[in-house]
């Protein structure tokens, strides 16, 4: 049975896991790490680097290194949050033809879905290397507060990466699945506080034991898709830049290279301050002026860090209050608090969470791996490998349509369990109105203009009738991925119009297919590049071995040594080119020449030894055998 892998596609780091028997295995990547940086870089030669390789060269190649692209996925370029982020990233964010936020790297435009697909391809390859088989299906997690456009965009990224996305599930829900695997028997209500690299979610989840089955029901969810560890880093970066400017008079913000170094130092300092009270930020040769090079060297205390980010931590408390209210629960009813996401390791965050819920959060759930583990469990459920789990997730935001006066009329309220289907009858606003426009909205505001527009479509050829008489049945259908399908039907004529919301900020089918082809081409290019590297490595090793053999067998016949020397030159010339087969052919010729040399050398050595042996056994005439006796030593 083909495995369905679980992928946590994170803002800062990503993780992949798979169910093996009754246990979940978090899979190490090719560098031996259990998480992979969600970073993609394009080199001068056009090679795509993902993960650690991309992170290592970020300081010297900041404008061509894309990170935190999850904050752009499914978003418009003109969104206020995107505009705010533009000031903090060294790479170029552009407005695509459809209004989306894309990135431009080395004069080529990439959608956020394409960049995410590079990361997903790395996760897919990591799983394939471990399992020893092709992987085509996955469960991918998203922040609970992702809207329809962001969910669809994530699913598209999976397709571009060559994965059939069997299910999109919410990150806190996945973490709850991971926690539920090892929890003690009995019913419980848990709060999952998920503060990751770029997003924040809070979910209240009930875990019930039903005839040996774990039933997970999400009671409520809330969050902020633009609050995460990256925002904490930005506060530290700005503090360091301001302090350096006050000290030296130089503003580092105009220097991309310096800012990339500052970003890495800020992240490192923040992490260190989770276990230490003070840390040194030391960046020699950060910049230079007429007087010479300048060095950044300053101390950062935990207290200072906490004062810099206190309002960000407080911002996470407001969604917690809303989630508890929506779940209709007092904090005293929560049995366990689970922390997810790397930023939740910060002591001040844990202190605030403890104060809010009135109990210490659990420390036995790995905040970096829990989401991928939960996704793998859901993958095993979908493949039929695991049968004792039932998951009931919710839609995070209300869905409805625009009605007379620019009002949003909700058909599906937020925190409704999915999948779900709701219908409502609407009518015309004018006499003899022959068409209606169905404007689909997502959000909690009363007026249509204040909510997110998902799509518009028209139902035409409505029979002439006075206003209010035609019956237009609008149906909203949300699937298990939280993706919406909408239909409108004239009950008198039976005419129907429907739409799958691919979101007004999504990619067209043609664009997705083109990007899939590009991704496959990249995979083919990567394979070709790897084959070339391996062939060159083999060539290098064979040349080294051949030279050593010629030195060691100096007495071998001259024509054999000449053949090897000529073959070495041929291999070196072939290795300068990019023809893998030519390199392999030259290496094969060298190996044959080497074999002939070694055979000749061995034959020569055997002949020399037999000659020396025969000579050694003959006694010259003047040699006399003598008797001797041993004399005791005094």
From Swiss-Prot:
InterPro entries, alphabetized: ATPase_NBD, Chaperone_DnaK, Heat_shock_70_CS, HSP70_C_sf, HSP70_peptide-bd_sf, Hsp_70_fam
CDD domains: ASKHA_NBD_HSP70_DnaK-like
Keyword ATP-binding: yes
Residue numbers carrying Phosphothreonine: 199
UniProt biased composition (Acidic residues): 623-634
MF (Gene Ontology): ATP binding; ATP-dependent protein folding chaperone; unfolded protein binding
Biological function: Acts as a chaperone.
Name recorded for this polypeptide: Chaperone protein DnaK
Organism: Acidithiobacillus ferrooxidans (strain ATCC 23270 / DSM 14882 / CIP 104768 / NCIMB 8455)
């Amino acid at each position: 049975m083909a495995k369905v892998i679980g992928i946590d596609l994170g803002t800062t780091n990503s993780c992949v896991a798979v169910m093996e028997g009754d246990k979940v295995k978090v899979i190490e990547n090719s560098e031996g790490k259990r998480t992979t940086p969600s970073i993609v870089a394009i080199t001068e030669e056009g090679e795509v680097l993902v993960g650690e390789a991309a992170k290592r060269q970020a300081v010297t190649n900041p404008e061509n290194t894309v990170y935190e692209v999850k904050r752009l996925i499914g978003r418009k370029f003109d969104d206020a949050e995107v505009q705010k982020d533009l000031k903090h990233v060294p790479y170029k964010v552009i407005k695509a033809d459809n209004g989306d936020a894309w990135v431009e790297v080395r004069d080529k435009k990439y959608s956020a879905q394409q960049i995410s697909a590079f990361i997903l391809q790395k996760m897919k390859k990591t799983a394939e290397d471990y399992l020893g088989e092709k992987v085509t299906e996955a469960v991918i997690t998203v922040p609970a507060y992702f809207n329809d456009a962001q969910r669809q965009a994530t699913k598209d990224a999976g397709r571009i990466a060559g994965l059939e996305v069997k299910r999109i599930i919410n990150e806190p829900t996945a973490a709850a699945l991971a926690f539920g695997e090892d929890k003690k028997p009995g019913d419980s209500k848990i709060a999952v506080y998920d503060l990751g690299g770029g997003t924040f979610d809070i979910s209240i989840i009930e875990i019930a034991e039903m005839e040996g089955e774990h039933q997970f029901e999400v009671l409520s969810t809330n969050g902020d898709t633009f609050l995460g560890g990256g925002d904490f880093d930005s506060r530290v970066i700005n503090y360091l830049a301001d302090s350096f400017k006050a000290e030296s008079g130089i503003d580092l913000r105009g220097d991309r290279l310096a800012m990339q170094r500052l970003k890495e130092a800020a992240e490192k300092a923040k992490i260190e301050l989770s276990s230490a009270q003070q840390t040194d930020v030391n960046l020699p040769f950060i910049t230079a002026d007429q007087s010479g090079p300048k060095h950044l060297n300053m101390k950062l205390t935990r207290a200072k860090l906490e004062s810099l980010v206190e309002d960000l931590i407080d911002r996470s408390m407001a969604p917690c209050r809303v989630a508890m209210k929506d779940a209709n629960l007092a904090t005293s009813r929560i049995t366990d608090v689970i922390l997810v996401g790397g930023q939740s390791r910060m002591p001040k965050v844990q202190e605030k969470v403890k104060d809010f819920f009135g109990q210490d959060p659990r420390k036995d759930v790995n905040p970096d791996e829990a989401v991928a583990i939960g996704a793998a469990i859901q993958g095993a459920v979908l493949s039929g490998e695991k049968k004792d789990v039932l998951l009931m997730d919710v839609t995070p935001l209300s869905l409805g349509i625009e009605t007379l006066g620019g009002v949003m009329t909700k058909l599906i309220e937020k925190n409704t369990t999915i999948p779900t289907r709701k219908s409502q009858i609407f009518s015309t606003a004018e006499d003899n109105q022959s068409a209606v426009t169905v404007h689909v909205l997502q959000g909690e505001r009363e007026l249509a203009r204040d909510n997110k527009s998902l799509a518009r479509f028209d139902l035409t050829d409505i029979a002439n009738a006075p206003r209010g008489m035609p019956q237009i049945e609008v149906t909203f259908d949300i699937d298990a991925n939280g993706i919406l399908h909408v239909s409108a039907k004239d009950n008198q004529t039976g005419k129907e119009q429907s739409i799958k919301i691919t979101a007004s900020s999504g990619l067209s089918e043609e664009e997705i297919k083109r990007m899939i082809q590009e991704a496959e081409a990249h995979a083919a290019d990567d394979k070709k590049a790897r084959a070339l590297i391996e062939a060159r490595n083999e060539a290098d090793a064979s040349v080294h071995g051949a030279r050593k053999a010629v030195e060691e067998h100096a007495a071998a016949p001259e024509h054999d040594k000449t053949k090897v020397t000529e073959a070495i030159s041929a291999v070196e010339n072939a290795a300068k080119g990019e023809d893998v087969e030519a390199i392999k052919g030259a290496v094969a010729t060298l190996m044959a020449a080497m074999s002939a040399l070694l055979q000749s050398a061995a034959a020569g050595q055997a002949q020399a030894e037999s000659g020396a042996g025969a000579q050694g056994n003959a006694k010259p005439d003047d040699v006399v055998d003598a008797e001797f006796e041993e004399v005791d030593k005094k």
